[in-house]
Amino acid sequence: MSDNSKTRVVVGMSGGVDSSVTALLLKEQGYDVIGIFMKNWDDTDENGVCTATEDYKDVVAVADQIGIPYYSVNFEKEYWDRVFEYFLAEYRAGRTPNPDVMCNKEIKFKAFLDYAITLGADYVATGHYARVARDEDGTVHMLRGVDNGKDQTYFLSQLSQEQLQKTMFPLGHLEKPEVRRLAEEAGLSTAKKKDSTGICFIGEKNFKNFLSNYLPAQPGRMMTVDGRDMGEHAGLMYYTIGQRGGLGIGGQHGGDNAPWFVVGKDLSKNILYVGQGFYHDSLMSTSLEASQVHFTREMPEEFTLECTAKFRYRQPDSKVTVHVKGEKTEVIFAEPQRAITPGQAVVFYDGEECLGGGLIDNAYRDGQVCQYI
């Protein structure tokens, strides 16, 4: 049996049940564990309570209980520069970003990893539902978490081989109810704490109100694809491709009573296009173009790959053919896909393994670009 006590693991602790159990398991396995609370955002909730302060209290309680040292580190500047500025720039460009993907790439597995190494870390660990498998030659493969409903490899798809080499995911083989049970059995103060939802820096706040603090809203016309004026939209940044709610036109209908969806955007003319029907023609595409495509292990500069892909979190896999050529990557779908959204991540899988992914630039319908920006 190996002596884990000589291996230092620095755990990113958020004050939630997942990272609490991560630290607990590593401590029980004999590792030299240090807990780190990352303060990435200066935040207060609707009641004026600083949520980070409350979360840090939970980290302190759990760390004291399981007997590990803990520190708090402030990454607010890094977060603003590397994640939030990107988030705003994407919305300005008419896209719908995924800040969680960028937060993992730039903060949790870069700024945090760099900091952990200064503490003598051999590995970092987080409460993500994912797994790593190590080959004899040292190559690390990232695998889906066993809990299919909680698998978070979609958000980890931009991690590099170097980052994965230094990473442990102790919860990857567990299902969420087991994690809660372990926390309760150990009497952890976070055992019944509610899971956080929403984008980390928005939390439960109203998204529209939050975004308007940073980007001025520019109302414009809402049109059908055949030119019918449906009224005013509040600003293109508030709508995403395929969105149903919040259009304010539910009572208006054409030939039937089918619900209305966002089916396109024209940033240059500030027009929001809407159409009726979940599978409206304008929502369907046959391929996409992606950039910032990255694989978790070394690949040739140009290659073609048959695999599956996800275009949003918790979506079933779809069969695709991936053509990687220089800066741009083309992804061709075996079956037409609905609401492929510029700015979101496309993530590639080979069975259980997450191969990597990129950011969606454009969707295409039979070679013609879909007007989604």
Curated annotation (Swiss-Prot):
Region annotated Interaction with target base in tRNA, chain positions: 98-100
Database matches in PANTHER family: MITOCHONDRIAL TRNA-SPECIFIC 2-THIOURIDYLASE 1 (PTHR11933:SF5), TRNA 5-METHYLAMINOMETHYL-2-THIOURIDYLATE -METHYLTRANSFERASE (PTHR11933)
Binding residues for ATP: G12, M13, S14, G15, G16, V17, D18, S19, M38, G127
Segment forming the signal sequence: none
Residue ranges of the region described as Interaction with tRNA: 150-152, 244-253, 312-313
Subcellular location: Cytoplasm
Residues the record marks as active site: C103 (nucleophile), C200 (cysteine persulfide intermediate)
HAMAP family: tRNA_thiouridyl_MnmA
Entry protein name: tRNA-specific 2-thiouridylase MnmA
Organism: Streptococcus pneumoniae serotype 4 (strain ATCC BAA-334 / TIGR4)
Enzyme Commission identifier(s): 2.8.1.13
Enzyme class: transferase
Molecular function as annotated in GO: ATP binding; tRNA binding; tRNA-uridine 2-sulfurtransferase activity
